[in-house]
């Protein structure tokens, strides 16, 4: 059902769907909703298995029979369209390795970016697993959750005491994001409000109209 749902949504949206997958950080809630209760190791196994299964059930081809440790299907015809990209928010080494082997994108989580210890210690695990599986590590894109304010005037400091991005003027945003792409290999950014603030339509509008086009233009010229 998951494979059918996401491939249908991808087709209807013109390819604007991304499937986010995780190993399950809330086992009690998953069990309450009828899901299997896995140990942490089993959850990572199931996570990797289901990503492979979703991909195999898309893009046409012969009927799929799968007898895995956690999932089984018999003679299911793949959807006639490709599966959407699968992104994960893996944290532990085993799930990071699974991301490298089978996923298409990785979000470090906790607003981590290329300056963070989380990124510096985790991305090599993804890359090593991808290479060991015969993949080009660059196939696994890094996409960042980027919180922060968009201010009218430049800020004296654009990062907090822990080195996390907190925002700045449009020019400061453009400089930071462009550096992330051109110098550190980032593939995309997701803007969200800092802290627990509500979504701000004005900020999202400025992001879409002023920041994103400027970053794309610079990357296209220099990339």
Regions found by a protein language model. Give the residues of each.
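Active-site-adjacent structural elements that line small-molecule/cofactor binding pockets in enzymes
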Residues: 1-223
């Amino acid at each position: 059902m998951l494979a059918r749902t996401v491939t249908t949504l991808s087709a209807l949206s013109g390819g604007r769907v991304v499937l986010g997958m995780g190993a399950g950080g809330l086992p009690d809630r998953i069990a309450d909703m009828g899901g299997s209760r896995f140990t942490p190791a089993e959850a990572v196994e199931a996570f990797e298995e289901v990503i492979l299964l979703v991909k195999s059930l898309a893009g046409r081809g012969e009927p799929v029979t799968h007898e895995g440790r956690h999932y089984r299907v018999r003679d299911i015809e793949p959807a006639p369209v490709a599966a959407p990209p699968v992104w994960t928010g893996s944290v532990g080494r085993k799930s990071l390795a699974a991301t490298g082997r089978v996923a298409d994108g990785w979000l470090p989580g906790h607003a981590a970016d290329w300056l963070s210890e989380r990124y510096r210690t985790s991305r090599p695990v993804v890359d090593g697993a991808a290479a060991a599986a015969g993949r080009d590590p660059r196939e696994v894109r890094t996409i960042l959750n980027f919180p922060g304010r968009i201010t009218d005037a430049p800020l004296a400091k654009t990062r907090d005491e822990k080195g996390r991005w907190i925002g700045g003027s449009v020019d400061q945003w453009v400089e930071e994001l462009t550096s992330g792409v051109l110098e550190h290999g980032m593939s995309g950014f997701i803007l969200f409000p800092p802290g627990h603030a509500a979504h701000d339509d004005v900020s999202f509008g400025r992001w879409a109209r002023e920041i994103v086009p400027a970053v794309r233009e610079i990357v296209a010229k220099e990339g």
